[in-house]
Design a protein with these regions (language model features):
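Short active-site neighborhood of thiol/selenol oxidoreductases, capturing the structured segment around
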Residues: 54-84, 95-99
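Extended hydrophobic-aromatic, low-complexity segments
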Residues: 55-56, 66, 74-79, 106-109, ...
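Structural microenvironment flanking redox-active thiols in thiol-disulfide oxidoreductases
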Residues: 77-115, 126-133
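Thiol/disulfide oxidoreductase modules built on the thioredoxin-like
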Residues: 127-170
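Short loop/turn microsegments at loop-to-beta-strand junctions
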Residues: 41-42, 63-64, 140-141
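Short acidic-hydrophobic, aromatic-tinged amphipathic segments that line or gate anion-handling sites
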Residues: 47, 120-125, 156
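Oxidative protein folding and maturation machinery
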Residues: 1-54
Length: 173
């Protein structure tokens, strides 16, 4: 939310003659304003490694973790082993959907990170999540935690903030 306030303030500071800069801030504000905590996350089609297509909203679980990642991303290569080793992310109350959101599906098929059997390892056909701008993904991996109704609980979370949230909600059960 702080970034949204910053963008709005920047737009107010611009004079009317700076149309290109104003449009840039307006675009960023639209992107950041998508899938806000408390809103229902944008649904999308994904395809798993077996070629089976499903909708994100059809994943039935008390909680769903979306991990938007790219096998060629250096930060993803560093972060994925930590996520894979996290026992909280193996809990049965949590469905994990590791998603490659871009269009180079051949690269995704040949460079995938070994994903636990319980997780869903998938891509979006034709990279529609990335190309349609349905999720604001300024860097990867990007973590979104959703509830059973697919409402956003955490947006672009860090691993630490995700862990803290999950410890709080999963230990209450």
């Amino acid at each position: 939310m702080t970034y949204m306030h910053f963008l709005r303030a920047q737009m107010e500071l611009l004079n009317d003659g700076d149309l290109a800069e104003r449009e840039r801030y307006a675009f960023l504000l639209r992107m950041v304003g998508q899938n806000l905590p408390g809103s229902v996350a944008r649904d999308f089609v994904f395809e798993d490694r077996k070629g089976v297509r499903s909708r994100m909203h059809s994943v039935a679980s008390p909680f769903t973790l979306l991990i938007f990642n790219d096998p060629e991303c250096e930060t993803c290569k560093e972060m994925m082993p930590k996520l894979l080793a996290d026992p909280l992310l193996q809990r049965e109350e949590l469905a994990v959907l590791a998603i490659y959101p871009d269009s180079d599906t051949e690269m995704w098929k040949t460079h995938g990170t070994p994903i636990p059997e319980r997780w869903i390892d998938a891509c979006t056909p034709n990279g529609e999540v990335m190309h349609n701008g349905w999720y604001y993904l300024p860097a990867m991996p990007s973590l979104y935690l959703l509830d059973a109704q697919k409402r956003v609980l955490l947006k672009d979370a860090t691993h630490d903030s995700l862990r803290q949230y999950l410890i709080g909600v999963l230990n209450r059960k």
